[in-house]
Amino acid sequence: MDNNIKKKKFAKREYIYRKRIPYGMMNFVTVRRDDCYYVDKTSYIEEIERSNKFFFYIRPRRFGKSLTLSMLKQYYDINMADRFEELFGGLYIGENPTPEHNTYLIISLNFAVVDANLENYKKGLDAHCNTEFNYFCDVYAQYLPVDIKEEMNRKDGAAEQLDYLCKECKKTGQKVYLFIDEYDHFTNTILAEPDCLNSYQAETHGTGYLRKFFDTIKSATDSTLERVFVTGVSPVTMDDLASGFNIGTNYSLSYEFNEMAGFTEEDVREMLTYYTDTLNLHNYTVDELIELMKPWYDNYCFAKASYGETTMYNSNMVLYFIDNYIRNRGRLPENMIEENIRLDYNKLRMLIRKDKEFAHDASIIQQLVENGFVAGELKTGFPAEQIGDPDNFVSLLYYFGMVTIAGTHQGKTKFVIPNEVVREQLFRYLLDTYKENDLKYDSYEKGKLESALAYCGEWKPYFEYIADSLHKYSSQRDRQKGEYFVHGFTLAMTCDNKFYRPISEKDTQEGYADIFLCPLVDNFSDMLHSYIVELKYAKSKDTDAHVEQLRQDAIRQVIRYAESEVVTSAIKTTQLHKIIVVYKGTEMVICEEVE
């Protein structure tokens, strides 16, 4: 019996070969060596070569920029010529190589590893560049003067060392391609700590050290620096360095490069089809999986001319979902959001802090919450000291991936929150800021109320809990914001509910619903209840007759919204509850269900 048990326990599991998912991978050589699924972006090499030689490209975090940079480095590296077929065979550029492939010496810098503290920035930049410059001398020794490494190390600092290397390469007739990833890394410190602004300006203007480094890059273009490719998440630093690096071209908003980072829906469909067919995972059709993923990961647009043609999925989010879907053997991830995708906390803290500097009727965040969109001019760049300008602020939100292009409104660019991952980040942060300002609640008690809401249809205690928290927390400043604050606070609290995807101002055929608690039935198949909430606000001094009029308006509206096709299809097997809530000041005076 023991032997049988052992045989059963250690029986080899059947394995179906499939391509690995390159989740979190940024090294192109590793992706190809390990036979990972690679969405082919190599056709953009032709577009890049047709562009100006000093290429500036920014995208939000986790959009595949670093992997694209890695691919470009392997394509152009003279030392990788004998591996061209291994790395690029079967890809577009492998079948259509350009004359420039494998003809460059590569200098690769990643400012993400440099200490972002301005007090240590010069030391960190020098150390990182020195490491990379020494590596450059070692791997390309056969193409360089014999004593170049020793002489380079005698030079003082990154700028002088780079200048020396480029001049020596010119003597030997070698071309150099410079890649800089996360060039704006230390800008994060400035955004999170505005007190550092003076030090930042000193570094990026006049005789500042970073300015000197980019001046060196500019001067090297007259010698051997043939191409430069720079990536980051914000145009702020480059704008401040512009007069020092005014030969670069910003292609971040260009139509032809809209799809270079991230995945198109066609890319996602092909990937899903490959894995579902290869592994025989047919719990959901590809169409059903797309329908599930789209609200969470899609809807980015990086060029005005691309609006209405195609939208982009965040590639990291897609890979996270598919990786979990496979490992769970065809079951959906319990959490649609991977922790590492969340925006850097301090960066988002800065955004909200800057937003609070606006008057309440001009607040960008409040407009997003109340209207579902904001309108403004999309700036290609702006200096750090002008982040507080409304158009600059909404542009910064755009570059960070917090809003995306959604057409035009009254002659300006229209921006919306792109998807539920971003919405969750934004409202969770708002909830955290409330907590930091003395909002206190029992998470265990709140969790019980959320479960009762989803499984027992006990809605009144849940909304009373939100109202009680709102009343206790609200300050005089918040009371002045009135409806904006009440709506935003309610949304933030409902966004912290794992059973629902709260949709604000859901556009239905008949109009707009304040909050639709869209049930995540695919994640919680046994949940029973969903909710559509019409929220009305009266000032403290308004009459009871006015409050009653708001109540009647809410009843008519919630009935109409609940019958829309969008809502009826989303609730699936759950029972829909039509709830109206009326606040008078910060007091909830009506909370009832409409039959």
Regions found by a protein language model. Give the residues of each.
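Substrate-engagement module of ASCE P-loop NTPases
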Residues: Y164-K171, S199-E226
